[in-house]
Structures are given as structure tokens and as C-alpha cells.
């Protein structure tokens, strides 16, 4: 079974995000970029399937600028076999991403597509679901456990108030939650090996997908600053402030 893993290049989660002066978006110049953390979990799970004899090949695909090849190399250094870079400039909205991934899936014919439940830059949580609808495949979102049973998949999902287990007919699409696994760190030898692994380069035009933006960002702003807290001497003072100042009692 071949596993296809879409990954996204995003601002590193350790970086403090800065909004552009004109409010048109987030400042990306000279900012450290890395693989979306949820996608790292997807790559790790695909590699575990291969190591467990359930998968034969892991292919990483990314849609974005030429620099997205660095994100693919991260996946290759973790252990993926090869990569596909679909070059696209500017913001590519989830529906367009799903349409491109549909074309890639039709070419690659994977038995499983596993991707992060959302990207930490836009938090859309849409691509996996849209891709499943376009392909007509089974899907399970927010996976915290994934098991392969022949050509089927058993997925435990994180839902409000507990867990839900579903069984999918392959081929299928699974989106990952944080508790699915802990991604490995790429070793130095594997980082060096990744430089020699193949990355096929495509363009959006190769797949005939219209990536024209259908959404307009009106304004981007930073979260409002929080009012500083105060220390109280005792319970009586706390109750007084909650009653007279906060008005919650």
C-alpha cells in the first residue's frame, strides 16, 4: 500500500507572529518556516505503517512556493521515500488545495491519504474533508489511533466528551489529531540521505486547477492585550472584587 502525505509550509510554531503594518496579512519576510505540526504527525504515522509492514511507500506532497521543497526534505529526512512539489505562488485556499491533491491522488493511486487535521496558520480544518468528497473516498477526522485491517482501516477519533471508533473501506483519507503519535527527530545521517531522495516538481497548470482566490481577507489584527491581573490578600477580598468590580457574583 502506498501512503500519500500532504504537508504544508507554515510559520514555525515557536515564532511570534507579526501582522503587517497595513493589516493585509502576516509578515513572512525573514521568518523561520517549518512543517505544519499536524502534518509532522501524519508523516510519522505513515512511517510507522511502513515500518510495521502495512505500507510499501510513503510519498510526501506539498503545494506552495519553491521554498516548500525544504518542508518536503524534512519529511524525507524523517524517512519518507520521495516527494512531490506543486509550485504555486500566493495563498492557495483549501478547496483549490483539495482539487490539486485529487489530481495527485489520481496519478499516484495511494491506498491511504493521511494529513494534519488543520494547519496552524489558517486553522481552516477543511482540506481533508473536501478531498474525501472530491474523490468519493471514506474519511475519518481527528484520528488519535489508526489500525490497518486488510484493505480496511479502523480509526479512533477524538470527539466531544470521549472517543469514537469507525471502520473505513479503503482507499481512505484520515486527518490526524495531536494524540495520534509523537513525531521523531530526523537523525543527521537521514538528513544527509534526504538530499539525494527525489522530489518531482509540478505546477498548478500541470493539473489544470484554477487557484483563483474566492475569499477576501478584509483585515488582519493581533489579539487584543489582556488586562493585568491583581493579587488579593484573602478570600474576603476576592469575593468583594468578584462582586463589586467583576459583577459575577
Curated annotation (Swiss-Prot):
Cofactor note: Binds 1 FAD per dimer. Binds 1 AMP per subunit.
Family matches, as Gene3D superfamilies: HUPs
The protein's required cofactors: FAD; AMP
InterPro entries for the chain: ET-Flavoprotein_bsu_CS, ETF_a/b_N, ETF_b, ETF_beta_N, Rossmann-like_a/b/a_fold
Organism in which the protein naturally occurs: Bradyrhizobium diazoefficiens (strain JCM 10833 / BCRC 13528 / IAM 13628 / NBRC 14792 / USDA 110)
Keywords on record: Electron transport, FAD, Flavoprotein, Transport
GO molecular function: electron transfer activity
Name recorded for this polypeptide: Electron transfer flavoprotein subunit beta
Family: Belongs to the ETF beta-subunit/FixA family.
Function: The electron transfer flavoprotein serves as a specific electron acceptor for other dehydrogenases. It transfers the electrons to the main respiratory chain via ETF-ubiquinone oxidoreductase (ETF dehydrogenase).
PANTHER family (alphabetical): ELECTRON TRANSFER FLAVOPROTEIN BETA-SUBUNIT, ELECTRON TRANSFER FLAVOPROTEIN SUBUNIT BETA
Top-level lineage group: Bacteria
Subunit structure: Heterodimer of an alpha and a beta subunit.
Amino acid at each position: 500500500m502506498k501512503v500519500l502525505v500532504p504537508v504544508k509550509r507554515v510559520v514555525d510554531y515557536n515564532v511570534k507572529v507579526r501582522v503587517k503594518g497595513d493589516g493585509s496579512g502576516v509578515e513572512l519576510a525573514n521568518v523561520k518556516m517549518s512543517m505544519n505540526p499536524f502534518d509532522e504527525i501524519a508523516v510519522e504515522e505513515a512511517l510507522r505503517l511502513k515500518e510495521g509492514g502495512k505500507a510499501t511507500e510513503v510519498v510526501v506532497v506539498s503545494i506552495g512556493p519553491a521554498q516548500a521543497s525544504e518542508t518536503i526534505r524534512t519529511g524525507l529526512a524523517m524517512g519518507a521515500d520521495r516527494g512531490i512539489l506543486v509550485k504555486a505562488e500566493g495563498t492557495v485556499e483549501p478547496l483549490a488545495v483539495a482539487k490539486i491533491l485529487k489530481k495527485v491522488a489520481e496519478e499516484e493511486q495511494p491506498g491511504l491519504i493521511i494529513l494534519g487535521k488543520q494547519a496552524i496558520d489558517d486553522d481552516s480544518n477543511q482540506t481533508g474533508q473536501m478531498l474525501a468528497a472530491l474523490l468519493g473516498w471514506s474519511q475519518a477526522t481527528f484520528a488519535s489511533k489508526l489500525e490497518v485491517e486488510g484493505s480496511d482501516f479502523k480509526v479512533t477519533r477524538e470527539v466531544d466528551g470521549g472517543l469514537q471508533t469507525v471502520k473505513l473501506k479503503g482507499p481512505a483519507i484520515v486527518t490526524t489529531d495531536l494524540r495520534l503519535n509523537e513525531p521523531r527527530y530526523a537523525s543527521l545521517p537521514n538528513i544527509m540521505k534526504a538530499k539525494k531522495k527525489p522530489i518531482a516538481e509540478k505546477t498548478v497548470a500541470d493539473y489544470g486547477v484554477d487557484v483563483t482566490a474566492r475569499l477576501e481577507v478584509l483585515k488582519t489584527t493581533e489579539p487584543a492585550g489582556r488586562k493585568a491581573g491583581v493579587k488579593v490578600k484573602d478570600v474576603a477580598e476576592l469575593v468583594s472584587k468578584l462582586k463589586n468590580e467583576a459583577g459575577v457574583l
